Amino acid sequence: MTLAEVLERIDRERPGESTEEEKLRWLSQVDGQWYREMVLTHEGAEETTFAPYTTDGDKSVALLIAPPYDEVYIHFLYMQIDQRLGEIDRYNNDAALYNQGMLEARQAYNREHMPLQGSRLRNIFPIYNPTRDSNNPLA
């Protein structure tokens, strides 16, 4: 899905409820998070770039989350609009759809892209040895 397709769909389905600047900021949040948490932590990151979307930027650019998971963009924008309008029930429905879509997109990305090997967690705390503890009466 391209940036222009998302903007056109939101304008058609929810006309006048948000400005283009707001929609671009929200889309930048989604793709920025995806880029940091998914793309940069997996092999092949050098093939993908991301810069926040602007009103004077190219609207034909493809968004980072590929089909069939790209509906997350629509649900995220609906979520933001509903939150601002105080439509809590609609917000909750859109949030559930967004979260489910992101979960499925992350799972698919993890299946298709190998995580970077240098990103393992390391134990930075020393191992406790009770025989070396001078305050331990059993030592």
What kind of feature is each model-predicted range?
Residues 1-63, 107-139:
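Conserved short "hinge" loops at termini or chain/domain junctions
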Residues 71-83:
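Short, hydrophobic/amphipathic alpha-helical patches that form generic packing surfaces
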Residues 62-71:
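Structural motif
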